Swiss-Prot record:
This is Transcription antitermination protein NusB. It comes from Bifidobacterium longum subsp. infantis (strain ATCC 15697 / DSM 20088 / JCM 1222 / NCTC 11817 / S12). GO terms for molecular function: RNA binding. Belongs to the NusB family. PANTHER family: ANTITERMINATION NUSB DOMAIN-CONTAINING PROTEIN (PTHR11078:SF3), N UTILIZATION SUBSTANCE PROTEIN B-RELATED (PTHR11078).
Length: 187
């Protein structure tokens, strides 16, 4: 079954859990055990639902951080869950390119949401991607810390080395990460 179909089925499950205020994993277990008239959930739909359930707090915080004026809890149920699926794919599923996650979210939004939603979803997911790509990977941060530690050890053992001369103002030569906040359109 195509991943697009799996995303739609995952959205149905997340939507139902959200509308019923039911635990996502409990509902997923019900859907797996008793699919009813529907065909069984595809493996990728199950992976999405489990991933969103496991990381929902972090996903919602990330979406809140990059969306001004609209907190996740105030978004439409369909919009909110499309965003959660795509954010999970962007942040936690390296098998899906960011662009594909955004394109798939937009395809769902264009068929299931109101006219303003696709632009909002696109802007918010683009901001999430920008922030993700601007942040150093956890392993590269650890490597940099090891290198700095080695450099400071070498400087401490060499009395002729005068060390780094740094600006006492604390300013950094590194450019600031771009602000990626999205303003919702209000008519």
């Amino acid at each position: 079954m195509a991943r697009s179909t799996a995303r739609k089925r995952a959205l149905n499950t997340l939507y139902e859990a959200d509308e019923k205020n039911q635990d996502i994993l409990s509902l997923l277990d019900e859907r797996i055990a008793h699919p009813g008239a529907q065909t069984p959930l595809p493996d990728y739909a199950i992976e999405i639902v489990k991933g969103v359930a496991e990381h929902r707090r972090q996903i919602d915080m990330t979406l809140d951080e990059h969306s001004t004026g609209w907190k996740v809890r105030r978004m439409g149920v369909v919009d909110r869950n499309i965003l959660r699926i795509a954010a999970w794919e962007i942040l936690f599923n390296d098998d899906v390119p960011d662009k594909v996650a955004i394109d798939e979210a937009l395809a769902l939004a264009k068929t299931l949401c109101d006219d303003d939603s696709p632009a909002f979803i696109h802007g918010l997911l683009s901001a999430v991607c920008t922030a993700k790509n601007a942040a150093p990977a956890p392993e590269s941060v650890a490597e940099e810390a090891d290198e700095e530690s080695s450099d400071s050890d070498a400087a401490a053992s060499d009395p002729t080395d005068e060390g780094d001369v740094s600006d006492s103002s604390g300013a950094s030569d590194e450019p600031a990460a771009p602000s990626a906040e999205i303003q919702p359109t209000v008519d």
